[in-house]
């Protein structure tokens, strides 16, 4: 059970992802003794792409070409324990710290596009020093306690075991669960945000994004159907919405909030 929370599956890149990664400028940083792999594309204000659990940065490659065409540069990272980055254990805090380290290395980061657990990691980073003009959150949990309790239920833990598991999780991450729940995460939501979620997502319920939208005054929520949790990342309309939202001359989506 602890492994299910802390050790992601390291999935291989597809052939198209290998080709995509080969076209970027690859570099790495040291984050808490682990090698953080990242790739840079384009020239302009930096957009950081953050992937989800047991995934890799190249799974968001569909956003890169349109962002470059819109005048941005793109930083694609593999979170600790994922893809080409080293490390066995990981969490949203590991990923959030990696984002902070990369942002510090790159200088100003204009925006973030984050999927699933990467969204939670981005929300935590935004509360802990990451400053952006805009961020896009795709199918992400907005409260970590909900995720941990769902894992406990899936493993049929009783109340005592669940409490012990929560204590272990907090010790592993080095922060309290309350600090990764929406009331705390909302403190970092001073900028404009776009929230995208599919109603047929069977991994993260759309209620998580609705709650995030409710707590974020400067956000827009767009709900889709039929895309699920992962296919949404390659949907042309979703990609277009995210890229248009990032463009500083296009306030259409923001004004709908």
Regions found by a protein language model. Give the residues of each.
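Short beta-strand/loop motif that positions the catalytic acidic residue
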Residues: 188-190, 195-197, 201
């Amino acid at each position: 059970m602890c492994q299910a929370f802390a050790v992601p599956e390291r999935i291989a890149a597809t052939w198209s992802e290998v080709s995509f990664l080969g076209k970027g400028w690859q570099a790495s940083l040291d984050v808490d003794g682990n090698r953080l792999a990242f790739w840079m594309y384009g020239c302009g204000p930096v957009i950081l792409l953050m992937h989800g659990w047991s995934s890799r940065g190249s799974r968001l490659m569909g956003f890169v070409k349109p962002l470059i065409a819109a005048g941005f540069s793109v930083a694609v990272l593999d979170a600790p324990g994922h893809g080409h980055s080293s490390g066995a254990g990981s969490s949203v805090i590991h990923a959030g710290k990696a984002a902070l380290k990369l942002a510090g290395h790159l200088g100003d980061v204009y925006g973030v596009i984050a999927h699933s657990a990467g969204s939670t990691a981005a929300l935590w980073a935004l509360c802990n020093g990451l400053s952006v003009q805009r961020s896009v959150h795709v199918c992400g949990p907005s409260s970590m306690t909900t995720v941990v309790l769902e894992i406990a239920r899936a493993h049929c833990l009783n109340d005592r075991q669940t409490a012990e598991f929560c204590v272990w999780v907090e010790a592993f991450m080095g922060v309290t669960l309350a600090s990764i729940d929406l009331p705390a995460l909302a403190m970092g939501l001073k900028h404009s945000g776009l929230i995208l979620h599919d109603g047929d997502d069977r991994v993260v319920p759309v209620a998580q994004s609705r709650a995030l939208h409710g707590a974020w005054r400067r956000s827009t929520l767009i709900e889709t159907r039929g895309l699920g949790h992962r296919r949404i990342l390659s949907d042309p309309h979703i990609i277009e919405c995210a890229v248009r939202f990032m463009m500083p001359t296009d306030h259409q989506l923001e004004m709908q909030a």
